[in-house]
Amino acid sequence: SFFYSLFKGTYNFIYVTIYSYLVDRTKMFFPFFFYLFLFICLSNLVGIVPFSFTITSHLNITFSLSFLVWWATCLLGFYESGLAFIAIFYVKGIPFVLVPFWALIEVISFIFRSVGLSLR
């Protein structure tokens, strides 16, 4: 049927996309990304209906989604890497004197990624 083909095509598209990034861990992350994609896609499709609006046009929804993804990234990073996750804030090749200042800038930019993502 048409709906089965539509669903299976969407399923395969998302699976192949995730597989290209997370080869051996696709099955672990697939449900999260699949339902996130469906939620955003279907929420935006509701906006096509006359006299309705998309819930993704509201800042509280987009901020909540980006904050959820940001926290999931942080928690998974600490779970997988432990304290070595903090190494993402260190940039190789900068003078030793600038390391604390640069790390502070990196932490602030990492925190504000969710805000920037929600404002898109």
From Swiss-Prot:
Coiled coil: none annotated. CDD domains: ATP-synt_Fo_a_6. It comes from the Eukaryota. InterPro entries: ATP_synth_F0_asu, ATP_synth_F0_asu_bact/mt, F0_ATP_A_sf. The keyword Ion transport applies. GO terms for cellular component: mitochondrial inner membrane; proton-transporting ATP synthase complex. It is found in: Mitochondrion inner membrane. GO terms for molecular function: proton-transporting ATP synthase activity, rotational mechanism. Its main location: mitochondrion. It holds the Pfam family ATP-synt_A. The chain crosses the membrane at residues 2-22, 29-49, 59-79, 94-116. F-type ATPases have 2 components, CF(1) - the catalytic core - and CF(0) - the membrane proton channel. CF(1) has five subunits: alpha(3), beta(3), gamma(1), delta(1), epsilon(1). CF(0) has three main subunits: a, b and c. Mitochondrial membrane ATP synthase (F(1)F(0) ATP synthase or Complex V) produces ATP from ADP in the presence of a proton gradient across the membrane which is generated by electron transport complexes of the respiratory chain. F-type ATPases consist of two structural domains, F(1) - containing the extramembraneous catalytic core and F(0) - containing the membrane proton channel, linked together by a central stalk and a peripheral stalk. During catalysis, ATP synthesis in the catalytic domain of F(1) is coupled via a rotary mechanism of the central stalk subunits to proton translocation. Belongs to the ATPase A chain family. This is ATP synthase subunit a. It comes from Naegleria fowleri.
